[in-house]
Curated annotation (Swiss-Prot):
Catalyzes the attachment of L-aspartate to tRNA(Asp) in a two-step reaction: L-aspartate is first activated by ATP to form Asp-AMP and then transferred to the acceptor end of tRNA(Asp). This is Aspartate--tRNA ligase. Homodimer. It catalyses: tRNA(Asp) + L-aspartate + ATP = L-aspartyl-tRNA(Asp) + AMP + diphosphate. It is found in: Cytoplasm. One of its GO terms (cellular component) is cytoplasm. ATP binds at R219, D220, E221, Q228, E482, G534, L535, D536, R537. Its EC number is 6.1.1.12. One of its GO terms (biological process) is aspartyl-tRNA aminoacylation. Keywords: Aminoacyl-tRNA synthetase, ATP-binding, Cytoplasm, Ligase, Nucleotide-binding, Protein biosynthesis. Belongs to the class-II aminoacyl-tRNA synthetase family. Type 1 subfamily. Residues 197-200 are annotated as: Aspartate. The gene is aspS. GO terms for molecular function: aspartate-tRNA ligase activity; ATP binding; catalytic activity, acting on a protein; nucleic acid binding; transferase activity.
Length: 591
């Protein structure tokens, strides 16, 4: 039988017509002489009705069918006696005249329904079953819709879709590369790209002018949160473009995706916020602007405080900053606040000072030190009776990171965030360099090919401090999540050489690693820039999904393992031999 339409697309317009549908048994109810089956396919569910008196053969097929069996059924569409408002086909059903079991199924490892009681690893092991759950299939359909819009948008704006290599040279961009040994050249290795960054710059040197690609990227980094070792980005580059042109291009794409894929109109242009303001007010370079509770500096008000933690911090050139939790005095106990204090110690905070605002003044561990300054503090902070005020003292990043975390975690706990909002924001004027505590050195805040602000080029000269420089870079933020970023690129080989030097590369090391780019810069590289969107994270936010893994068909788990195929796995000795590799067994941990 040839399928006439998707089960989930069967409609009232087909009442009285004969249709053929095929799909999985989502539910089966045997009422004696009648059997009802909910047949599912990617478009939804339709109810099949099998009547023993009307068609014995079809009824017997339904009698043998079980959950997740695959059926094909031919029958007449008719109106349902009782409408089911929970499904799109709830006004009709199919009276089956002929049916056949196309495939049987073992008992599923978990219920194939949206509210599933199963571990994530079990779901990933049977991902092909997990994806039959309606919301999971809807995530894939949304992702497909977004990528379709992306292709159409860039095609209509004169961009060329150009593929770049996935086997290339190792040029680490902050994270570790995944390396691939060469059989032909023993001891030599390819690397999987962390991004198409260098190749898209070379495409601009080639005269492509406007490039885009939906690209796979790979980073061998320690997993945290929702990060994946392989991920997908919407990559773009434009020659002879100013930052405003690139941002307008991105806003046009976002506006169209929001309208066509999500049904939401977002106003453009998006707000712009300088990196410094984002850090000062939100404690984050990806601020969530859906709620207030802004960070405020009170260093000048407490510099002479009898509370030595505050006064000594300010005397050392550091900061005392605070947030006000509206109505928090009754909502957070001393025990609750201590838990918050313990958490922010991971950011380097020495402690968390707090007071509750009462009619009589401040109440709390440091109240006796601050009551003399209460009026000035309350005026600065707009604190009212019943509020909780949290203070952190320390260096710029300690204070920002700690209060940024407190701001976001408390907003979630107090339900201060409107989850239906989509607040897009540009964060601009980033520092060119940042100090990485893990690596113990200065690194590029975005990447080493980012062009500095024209006024800051002087900081690359001998005797100047390059770490004061700011870059022509910009991130696009949605609801406190970075979903993309970009910059104007360096097109002058002399400037590029100075940036490499500021990052600690010798001339020889820079030539060995990036010689091909330097050569391109010396052979007619146009002024250019671009950006990239993280497709996985963007779709996750549009779908209101719980995890980035929900919007990827076959993701890795939080340990970078794919339970379905048990990757990564071992290979046999013959494969290692032809690659001229030996594997040394890692020593066991001491017990």
């Amino acid at each position: 039988m040839k399928r006439t339409n998707y089960a989930g697309r069967t409609s009232e317009e087909q009442i009285g017509q004969e249709v053929v549908v095929k799909g999985w048994v989502a539910k089966r109810r045997n009422l004696g002489g009648l059997i009802f089956i909910d047949l599912w396919d990617r478009e939804g569910i339709v109810q099949l009705v099998f009547n023993e008196e009307e068609d014995q053969a079809a009824f017997e097929v339904a009698n043998q069918a079980r959950n997740q069996y695959i059926l094909e059924a031919r029958g007449l569409v008719r109106a349902r006696a009782e409408v089911n408002p929970d499904i799109a086909t709830g006004k009709i059903e199919i009276e089956v005249k002929e049916a056949k079991i196309l495939a049987k199924s073992q008992t599923p490892p978990f219920e194939v329904q949206d509210d599933v009681d199963a571990s994530e690893d079990l779901r990933l092991k049977y991902r092909y079953v997990d994806l039959r759950r309606p919301k999971m299939m809807n995530y894939l359909k949304l992702r497909s819709k977004v990528t379709s819009i992306v292709h159409n948008y860039f095609d209509n704006n004169d961009f060329l879709d150009v593929e770049t290599p996935e086997l290339t040279r190792s040029t680490p961009e902050g994270a570790r590369d995944y390396i691939v040994p060469s059989r032909v050249y023993p001891g030599h290795f390819y690397a999987l790209p962390q991004s198409p960054q260098l190749f898209k710059q070379l495409l601009m040197a080639a005269g492509v002018d406007k490039y885009y690609q939906i690209a796979k990227c790979f980073r061998d980094e320690d997993l945290r949160g929702d990060r994946q070792p392989e991920f997908t980005q919407i990559d773009t580059e434009m020659s002879f473009a100013e930052p405003e042109e690139i941002q307008a291009m991105a806003e046009g794409l976002i506006k169209r995706v929001m309208k066509e894929a999500v049904g939401v109109d977002v106003p453009t242009p998006f707000p712009r916020m300088e990196w410094q303001e984002a850090m000062d007010k939100y404690g984050s370079d990806k601020p969530d602007t859906r709620f207030d509770m802004l960070i405020q500096d009170v260093s000048d008000l407490v510099k002479d405080s009898s509370f030595k933690v505050f006064s000594a911090t300010v005397a050392d050139g550091n900061f005392v900053r605070a947030i006000v939790v509206p109505g928090g005095a009754d909502k957070y106990s001393r025990k609750d606040i201590t838990k918050k204090e313990d958490y922010i110690k991971r950011y380097g905070a020495k402690g968390l000072a707090w007071v509750k605002v009462t009619e009589e003044g401040y109440n709390g561990p440091v109240a006796k030190f601050l009551n003399d300054d209460a009026n000035a503090l309350n005026e600065r902070l707009s604190a009212k009776v019943g509020d909780l005020v949290l203070f952190v003292a320390g260096s710029f990043h300690v204070v920002c990171d700690s209060l940024g975390y407190l701001r976001e975690s408390i907003a979630k706990e107090l339900d201060l965030i409107d989850e239906n909002k989509f607040n897009y924001l540009w964060v601009i004027n980033w520092p060119m360099f940042e100090y990485d505590e893990g690596f113990g050195k200065w690194i590029a805040a975005h990447h080493p090919f980012t062009m500095l602000n024209e006024d800051d080029l002087k900081y690359l000269e001998e005797g100047e401090d390059p770490h004061q420089a700011h870059a022509q870079s910009y991130d696009i933020v949605l609801n406190g999540n970075e979903i993309g970023g970009g910059s104007i690129r360096i097109h002058d080989p002399e400037v590029q050489e100075k940036v490499f030097k500021a990052l600690g590369y010798t001339k020889e090391a820079a030539q060995a690693r990036f010689g091909f780019l330097i050569k391109a810069l010396e052979n007619g590289m146009p002024p250019e820039g671009g950006m990239a969107f993280g497709l996985d994270r963007w779709v996750m936010l549009l779908a209101h999904a719980d995890s980035i893994r929900d919007v990827i068909a076959f993701p890795k788990n939080s340990k970078a393992v794919e339970p379905l195929t048990a990757a990564p796995g071992t290979v046999d000795d013959e494969q290692l031999e032809v690659l001229h590799l030996n594997v040394e067994e890692a020593p066991k941990e001491a017990e």
